[in-house]
Regions:
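Glycine/proline-centered hinge or cleavage motifs at structural transition points of membrane proteins
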Residues: 117, 176-177, 190
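Transmembrane-helix boundary motif in ABC transporter permease subunits
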Residues: 78-110, 123, 273-282
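Transmembrane alpha-helical segments of polytopic membrane transport and secretion proteins
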Residues: 1-24, 273-287
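Generic hydrophobic transmembrane alpha-helix motif, especially the helices
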Residues: 111-149
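Periplasmic/extracellular loop-to-transmembrane helix junction in inner-membrane transport proteins
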Residues: 3-19, 36-78, 99, 244-253
Length: 287
């Protein structure tokens, strides 16, 4: 009887192992196919002229240089604001307001906001920033909308990173006479900086891939604006440009070229996040 049960368990374990292996292989094959397909369609259409010039309807040339700059402007503006607010809020909730009822309320609200479709953020951003505050359609309106979208993610990842720092580290620093802020600045933050940086890098990836919210707030102009005034002007990011080249102009080659650039950026960000995590993890183990 025992041998029969043992044989059934081995057969069941083997079957499940094979099924899980097939599922993993299919997932990997799908991702690999997607990467190869996009690159095979996009790389032949990449050129220095495409990357370094602005589009001109008079001469019939196509260029995405303004879209690249607009993407960089929005990423920089968004990440500067969202990191300041998100990390600051996480520090307050974890270190100063720990255990209070407001923490649970804010955490629940943050998790709820994370599940809202981005197009709703775009609609709210258009009504709030573009209309109510009179920013009109501009990169800064798009950046502020993306701040609201990514704030819950940065805040929650920072909170979880702060919680990984052992309480004994804080108590030891307090025992040496250090104040609350000094403990946070010199003990807590250095102990979880890898998680904070990783969360910020992954947020950059989400910002790069956003399009629906920016259609409502940042606009879709392909104009090369002045550096100091670009943030107050409308402009298309790479994702918005991809949509318009594919949907409106029928330029699928250019759309795939932009998709290749975005895919490469996302891959580099994921690699950077992995490198940061491994490096700081190695330093912690050495300590």
């Amino acid at each position: 009887m025992k041998q029969r049960l043992s044989g059934k368990r081995r057969a069941y374990a083997t079957t499940m192992k094979i099924l899980m292996g097939i599922a993993a292989g299919m997932a990997a094959a799908l991702v690999l196919f997607l990467i190869i397909y996009v690159l095979s369609k996009g790389l032949p259409n990449l050129s220095w002229q495409l990357l370094s010039t602005a589009p001109s309807y008079l001469s019939g040339t196509i260029g995405i240089w303004p879209d690249i700059l607009n993407t960089l402007y929005i990423v920089l503006a968004t990440i500067l604001i969202v990191v300041s607010l998100g990390v600051g809020a996480a520090i307050y909730l974890t270190e100063y307001a720990a255990g209070s009822r407001i923490v649970a309320v804010i955490e629940y609200a943050a998790e709820t906001l994370s599940g809202i479709p981005s197009i709703i953020y775009g609609l709210v951003g258009m009504l709030f920033f573009c209309e109510f505050f009179g920013m009109q359609t501009s990169l800064i309106a798009g950046a502020l909308t993306l701040v609201i979208m990514n704030l819950p993610t940065v805040m929650r990842t920072t909170q979880e990173s702060l919680k990984t720092v052992p309480q004994s580290y804080r108590e030891g620093a307090f025992g040496l006479g250090a104040g609350k802020w000094r403990v946070i600045r010199t003990v807590v933050l250095p102990g979880c900086v890898d998680g904070v940086i990783t969360g910020c890098i992954l947020s950059v990836g989400r910002i790069l891939g956003e399009s629906a919210a920016l259609l409502f707030t940042a606009g879709f102009g392909h104009v090369l604006n002045d550096f100091f005034t670009a943030i107050t002007k409308p402009g298309a990011t790479l994702t918005v440009a991809l949509y318009f080249y594919a949907k409106e102009d029928g330029e699928f080659g250019v759309a795939f070229a932009i998709a290749s650039i975005l895919m490469a950026m996302t891959l580099l960000l994921n690699i950077a996040a992995g490198v940061v995590t491994k490096r700081f993890g190695r330093e912690k183990n050495n300590e």
